[in-house]
């Protein structure tokens, strides 16, 4: 079998992947030896109807029975939206590497033309293509480009606890050298005295845990390169030179200053990219990769499937979520599953020395909230359990009324839409800045007097040029806080952060933008109780040990307070009839505007306007109906 780097990562997720992959590729159980410890489906003389149904169900979960359509393939919307930009990132990253290492780095935008290595065994052919490859007289440099940012790497530190509550100063794991490359320096600290303690190998290994974890936000990139290293070192193309491994990522500290002369070093001396020397780290993973390769080959030979194998390797809700997630997690995707618990740590009431995560409960065949009572130890989960058992709705009317009493008229319901391009587009932006291109505003001057069309204001950038000042001017004009008022948003972190960013980039509008920011009221916090919403509610503060954090809960929320989940509980309003149905589709639609015909453009432009308007009108309906439920 030909096994790419990506397939290697998938086949080593868990023992089940190989069996499911064989079924998926061949559309048959002919090679699978065990399914949930039942007899092979092909041994029809010894199989009962229950086993047959169970196995057919797996195949039916992969392909539509009538059309044969692949039910597991889900497109990556973010990848689609920014595909051309990712290509540009790789191109610019290699250009930057050449400025540091010389022009001899081999690279290509076409994968087939990149440097290729393969490792052939009796059973499989492991192969990889390299983003950048440079062979010098005494050494080889290998470059992997990732369209992520440097923040997660720069945030890694070695920290020693000096007292029970004080961690002391931090020591960075990566430090920039004279050539502008970030070296891994953790081992340089070994034996040094730090905060009156001697740094030991255990301290260093503790600091490296995330780097060596293939499922952490930094470790997954290291693991990628470690697989490349294993293939290269075992390939027939003997290098016989020292090999250095480098990871190139976007610099989160870089600020675009001149749109006409893009990506030059900014005024703070920051480049668009950072290069990390990860040679020492991938060497630490060499034995682990070799072990994984042996497990992979054993699993491909045995093709065993056991449903009770879920864990962080499934990468639940990540863009890298396992393709077979719908099969393994089927019982957990049903209404009322333990995935809906707001707190996903559990403790057995009869043995409070051990805690469990949601994976461990599921692997013990506990899938439903109603069956998890013995493992509930905190208020949020208990009240969710109570709502399920009693089929009831929870609302803390007194607390909700207290929150609603903070709202002053006129009310401005505000929602932003943004485009988080990997490459900064406009002055003052960083990689992945949430660049605003649209807002929607519903205005309720008097209580319960607001019309979806008549009392609506909006702004939508007509193209991909910089229209932020136009948006700011329009926003300031539409939100009149001269005589007070409230700006209602849903999840304040987003709107507050965007307003603060605009105020910093355009200081001439800072005072008015920050005034809008200071009047923000988070409708989501009224429901979920997070943030500072109820800190001033003295009655709640007195009784909160007996109450859940949230002030409202309905089983139809399914453990989420997102506006898409909350809206159906309070209103018949739906997004299903809209051409643009969610934020991801809004990004995709905005992204393609310059490529459309005039007719297509008008249709998509209108679709974006309707979608954003729906978000603010949804807040209107939620607030009005919440008032009724709270008798306010």
PLM feature segments, named:
Residues 49-66, 158-213, 268-281, 285, ...:
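Charged, glycine/proline-rich intrinsically disordered loops and linkers
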Residues 110-117, 409-420, 522:
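Two-metal-ion RNase H-like nuclease active-site motif
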Residues 112-116, 129, 134, 138, ...:
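Conserved DEDDh/DEDDy metal-dependent 3′-5′ exonuclease domain
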Residues 90, 94-99, 142-144, 149, ...:
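Conserved RNase H-like, two-metal-ion catalytic cores of nucleic-acid enzymes
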Residues 214-221, 227-230, 244-250, 260-264, ...:
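Acidic, Mg2+-coordinating catalytic module of metal-dependent nucleases/exonucleases
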């Amino acid at each position: 079998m030909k096994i790419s780097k990506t397939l290697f990562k998938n086949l080593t997720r868990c023992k089940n992947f190989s069996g499911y992959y064989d079924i998926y590729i061949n559309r048959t159980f002919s090679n699978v030896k065990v399914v949930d410890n039942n007899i092979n489906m092909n041994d029809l003389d010894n199989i009962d109807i229950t086993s047959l149904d169970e196995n057919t169900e797996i195949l039916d979960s992969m392909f539509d029975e009538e059309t044969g359509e692949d039910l597991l393939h889900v497109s990556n919307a973010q990848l689609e939206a920014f595909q051309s930009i990712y290509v540009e990132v790789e191109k610019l990253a290699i250009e930057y590497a050449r400025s540091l290492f010389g022009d001899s780095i081999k690279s290509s935008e076409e994968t087939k033309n990149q440097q290729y290595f393969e490792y052939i065994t009796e059973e499989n052919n492991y192969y990889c293509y390299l983003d950048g490859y440079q062979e010098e007289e005494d050494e080889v440099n290998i470059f992997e480009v990732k369209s992520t940012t440097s923040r997660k790497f720069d945030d890694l530190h070695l920290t020693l606890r000096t007292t029970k509550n004080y961690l002391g100063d931090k020591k960075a794991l990566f430090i920039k050298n004279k050539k502008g490359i970030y070296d891994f320096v953790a081992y340089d600290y070994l034996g040094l005295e730090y905060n009156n303690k001697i740094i030991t190998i255990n301290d260093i290994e503790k600091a490296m845990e995330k780097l060596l974890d293939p499922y952490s936000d930094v470790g997954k990139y290291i693991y990628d390169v470690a697989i490349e290293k294993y293939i290269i070192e075992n390939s027939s193309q003997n290098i016989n030179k020292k090999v250095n491994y480098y990871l190139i990522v976007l610099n989160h500290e870089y600020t675009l200053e001149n749109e006409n002369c893009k990506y030059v070093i900014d005024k703070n001396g920051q480049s668009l990219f950072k290069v990390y020397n990860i040679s020492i780290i991938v060497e630490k993973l060499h034995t682990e990769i070799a072990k994984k390769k042996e497990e992979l080959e054993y699993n491909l030979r045995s093709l065993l499937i056991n449903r009770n194998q879920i864990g962080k390797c499934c990468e639940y809700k990540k863009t890298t979520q396992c393709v077979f997630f719908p099969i393994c997690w089927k019982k957990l995707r049903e209404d009322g599953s333990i995935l809906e618990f707001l707190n996903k740590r559990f403790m057995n009431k009869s043995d409070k020395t051990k805690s469990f995560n949601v994976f461990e409960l599921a692997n013990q065949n506990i899938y439903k909230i109603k069956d998890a009572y013995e493992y509930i130890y905190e208020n949020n989960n208990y009240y969710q359990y109570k709502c399920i058992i009693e089929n009831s709705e929870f609302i803390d009317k007194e607390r909700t009324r207290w929150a609603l009493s903070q709202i002053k008229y006129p009310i401005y319901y505000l929602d932003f839409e943004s485009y988080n391009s990997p490459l900064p587009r406009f002055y003052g932006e960083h990689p992945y800045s949430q660049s605003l291109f649209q807002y929607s505003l519903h205005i309720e001057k008097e209580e319960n007097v607001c019309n979806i069309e008549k009392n609506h204001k909006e702004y939508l950038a007509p193209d991909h040029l910089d229209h932020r000042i136009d948006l700011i001017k329009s926003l300031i004009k539409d939100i009149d806080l001269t005589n007070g008022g409230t700006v209602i948003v849903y999840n304040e972190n987003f709107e507050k952060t965007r307003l603060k960013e605009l105020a910093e980039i355009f200081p001439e509008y800072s005072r008015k933008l920050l005034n809008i920011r200071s009047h923000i009221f988070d409708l989501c916090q009224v429901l979920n109780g997070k943030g500072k919403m109820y800190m001033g509610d003295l009655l709640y503060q007195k009784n909160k040990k007996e109450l859940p954090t949230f002030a409202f809960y309905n089983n139809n929320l399914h453990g989420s307070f997102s506006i898409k989940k909350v809206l159906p509980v309070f209103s018949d309003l739906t997004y299903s009839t809209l051409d643009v149905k969610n934020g991801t589709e809004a990004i995709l639609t905005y992204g393609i505007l310059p490529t459309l015909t005039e007719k297509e453009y008008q249709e998509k432009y209108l679709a974006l306007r309707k979608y954003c308007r729906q978000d603010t009108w949804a807040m209107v309906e939620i607030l009005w109906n919440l008032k009724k439920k709270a008798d306010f």
